Amino acid sequence: MAVREINYNNSKSMDECRLIKVDNDISYIAPTSNPLSANVVVIQGRESEWIYDVGAHPDIPGLLETLNPDSRKVNVVLSHFHGDHIGNLFKIRYDEVYQGRLTYKHTNTGVIIESDVFFQDGDISLHLFPLPSSHAKGCVAFEVNEKYCFLGDGVYAMEKGDSR
């Protein structure tokens, strides 16, 4: 599978946003440290565009807009409530938001995921489910086609540093 990278930078004083194509239907915007921003996963379904986490980098909303030129329905799935994952939520266009109960307390919008939820969007099968986490309680995982599973910070190193 060929991975294609696109660089996007409107904010010259900050890290560049990099869009990396995983396959025909899945891309992600790589995380940045200036400002701190999580991975943003974009799935192109037949009916909708699905976004897992919206990051916090100010260039992400513009980049997401270029990925959906036909203005298809946009569904956002939030892994958890930390700002580097939800910071751009109210800066992008979306039709529905799916998240855990604790994240809902921060967004006050959308659907709360408390058990497995399944969607079919053309050839793409989507599965949202609660994920216990030591990093942030109430994480929601996002599985695509039983091949990829996105966890946000659901699996997270408790300590940074060299393991040697």
Q: What are the residue ranges of the model-derived segments?
A:
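Metallo-beta-lactamase
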Residues: M1-N24, V42-H57, Y94-R164
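Short secondary-structure boundary/capping segments
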Residues: R18-I20, T32-S33, V41-V42, L89, ...
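Pre-active-site segment of Zn-dependent metallo-hydrolases
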Residues: Y28-V40, Q44-N75
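Residues that form or flank phosphate/diphosphate-binding pockets in enzymes
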Residues: A38, G87, K137
